[in-house]
């Protein structure tokens, strides 16, 4: 990460945290946004953790869902310790495109194991590179040269090799699992729904027209009845409802807090995200006191959207984060839902 100082891309064991949280609460569901399935032991290990968690939930008599948002992980260093690195010169020069293809392979393995299939690595889709996978003709020519011939397609050996396997336990309720794919690729969003019902995330900076196109596509491809809330809208929240401040002072303080955090956010993205996405980015933050935050939500989001709120970016004051979340629920939500003045 070229322009970031501090912790990023942490691979925490989400399932242990989820179990502890559910043991201490009655109504709250827990989710990951997002879990890298190329890290964390890879797709087979993640599938086993999911099945084991949901089975234990049934034993405990807890019917709450586990919400697993999963992705390849933005940062290469997260997956590298798990062997997700180029294996030869062809893979090295093709890596920007190939890493995404490995994620396709991992998705199919994980989803089929979760579904209860018995699979062999030969059953999984092959990875094939062609010109369409690369931004420029020059990039594709570089890969062809490394391959040693100008083939229209280059077959890449599978990343995961295994004999017939299945995940144990087999008998658990899949209704207790909600899967959400963190990928902007339309083809992958459609592909994963061949195996299991999989909802979708988009980046917080995704343009509105892309959001609407995704909803239309998911109406056709989702394994089930698609609802708008099934694609959470990620948004950073810079809310100030601190005591002792006037309404204008709250807004000024919120803007100051947001300025520093968002500057760091954009710096962190540089070199880790497709520059075209950054260039076309949409506003990804709501900023101000309760009234202005509520107004921004009503102006920018569809009434049926579900918001996934990010309160803690660049904040290390846990008590302040808790106050902000409480203020959001007590003061912002009633205004958005029509219960306030």
Please annotate each region the language model reported.
Residues 4-8, 31-41, 94-97, 282-287:
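The substrate-binding groove and active-site-proximal loops of carbohydrate-active enzymes
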Residues 1-28:
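N-terminal beta1-alpha1-beta2 module of alpha/beta enzyme domains
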Residues 18-27, 53-65, 191-194, 218-226, ...:
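Acidic (Asp/Glu)-rich catalytic clusters
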Residues 288-340:
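Long, low-complexity C-terminal extensions of enzymes
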Residues 38-55, 285-292:
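Glycine-rich anion/phosphate-binding loops
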Residues 89-170, 207-305, 339:
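An alpha-helical appendage that flanks or caps ligand/catalytic pockets
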Residues 30-33, 64-70, 177-183, 197-203, ...:
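Hydrophobic faces of well-ordered beta-strands that scaffold small-molecule active sites
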